Design a protein with these regions (language model features):
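Bacterial Sec-dependent N-terminal signal peptides
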Residues: 1-23
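Preference for long, amphipathic alpha-helical scaffolds in soluble/luminal domains
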Residues: 21-383
């Protein structure tokens, strides 16, 4: 960890009277952005330059391992870049520096022959970095590129490229739609024949459908203002029906196996709502609001509360949704945004069985990402 970031950690700690209690001191957004900047890897031997360190933990171990992936660094850039116009000139310049350091980081995740990206490094391929015996399978077990990483990375890089890259990427997505070459065997039978986007961009993988991933994929089209095709409409309509059926509340780990939690699904739904131009999707706003308010009333973890507050703010619900707690609380690794889950590769009924046992499941944590969500909350509260 960089010494400057360590000093800020200490300062944030002493301002908090007791862990979990509200701090009287109001934290300026520039302090948080500076902390994020200081947590960005800078010629660190343990992590490539420009990225943000992420940790993973298996369900059967208490050990946290550094995981080099594209996803969290892209999420941080996307979260911050959305609110550049609301930042001070000094913070805008700092954000520019963060972006410039991060852009080269994505090169080793980019497919050299296609417009898509991978979760882990591709050249050479790596799975579960620092994974011990798992790394004997780096080549044979390498994952294909996927629509989730592709969408978020492309959104993170929006200010640094032109729309042609997004157009090419979306075309690549259409080649791996459910029922095109394969039909999903790990989703509700009621919807298994829906022509919607599959997570994996590879013919050797089973078709995986994830509610949150679908939100991110549609978000790419909405922010880049790409014309919606029939697959987009099908995907929107599936999301609408799943919300009406309350699958995100009753069955979150099945309907969104890469994210698993109701609060996180609601956050994805609300972020898509903020940018969406699909009129039928706008009609489910009230249900998402009610669901988020209910979830917030019973939320326990700081990041969980923050995501739900941001969900309501994305939906235009103004209120006391600013997390005034010390951001140091977000350093706790007690609520993961994303999981790597063997169950996503399995057909029914094995998918449900493995999901319940949490066998071969890894939770991912990234403190700089949590801080970017805190900043998102701050700026969503600004006029």
């Amino acid at each position: 960890m960089h010494y400057r970031a360590f000093y800020i950690f200490c300062w944030l700690s002493v301002t908090n009277i007791a862990l979990g209690q509200k701090a009287d001191l109001k934290i300026a957004p520039s302090v948080i952005l500076k902390l994020i900047s200081d947590l960005q890897s800078n010629n660190d031997t343990a992590f490539p330059n420009g990225g943000f360190v992420t940790f993973r933990k298996s369900n059967w171990s208490s050990q946290f391992k550094i995981d080099q992936n594209s996803f969290y660094t892209a999420l941080i850039l996307f979260n911050l870049n959305q609110y550049e116009a609301k930042m001070s000139k000094e913070d805008q310049y700092l954000l520019y520096q963060i972006n410039q350091k991060a852009i080269p980081y994505f090169i080793n995740f980019k497919n050299k022959n296609k417009p898509s990206y991978n979760f882990w490094p591709k050249y050479p391929p790596v799975i579960f970095p620092n994974g011990g015996w798992l790394n004997h399978f780096n080549a044979s077990g390498a994952l294909p590129d996927d629509i989730d990483d592709g969408s978020i990375i492309q959104l993170a890089l929006k200010n640094n490229d032109n729309d042609s890259f997004a157009i090419a990427l979306k075309h690549e997505f259409t080649l791996f739609v459910n029922t095109t070459t394969k039909t999903t065997k790990g989703f509700y039978s009621k919807y298994k024949n829906q022509k919607v986007y599959g997570t994996w961009l590879g013919n050797k993988m089973p078709v995986d459908i994830d509610m949150s991933v679908l939100c991110n994929t549609l978000l790419l089209s909405e922010i880049y203002q790409l014309p919606l095709n029939q697959i987009d409409s099908n995907t929107y309509n599936l999301l609408i029906q799943l919300v009406k059926d309350a699958k995100h509340l009753k069955d979150p780990s099945y309907v969104s196996p890469h994210y698993e939690k109701s609060a996180i699904i609601l956050y994805h739904l609300s972020r898509l709502y903020k940018y969406s131009h699909y009129s039928l999707y706008k009609n489910i706003k009230n249900q998402i609001v009610q669901d988020a308010q209910m979830a917030l009333s019973i939320a326990h973890f700081p990041l969980e509360k923050l995501l739900l507050q941001n969900t309501l703010l994305n939906l235009g619900e103004k209120g006391a949704y600013l997390l005034a707690d010390n951001p140091f609380l977000l350093q706790q690794n007690n609520y993961s945004l994303f999981v790597a889950n063997l169950a996503t590769l399995l057909p029914n009924p094995f998918k449900r069985w493995v999901t319940k046992t949490k066998f071969f499941r890894y939770s991912y944590y990234c403190y700089p990402y949590n801080l970017s969500v805190w900043l998102e909350n701050y700026y969503l509260n600004q006029p």
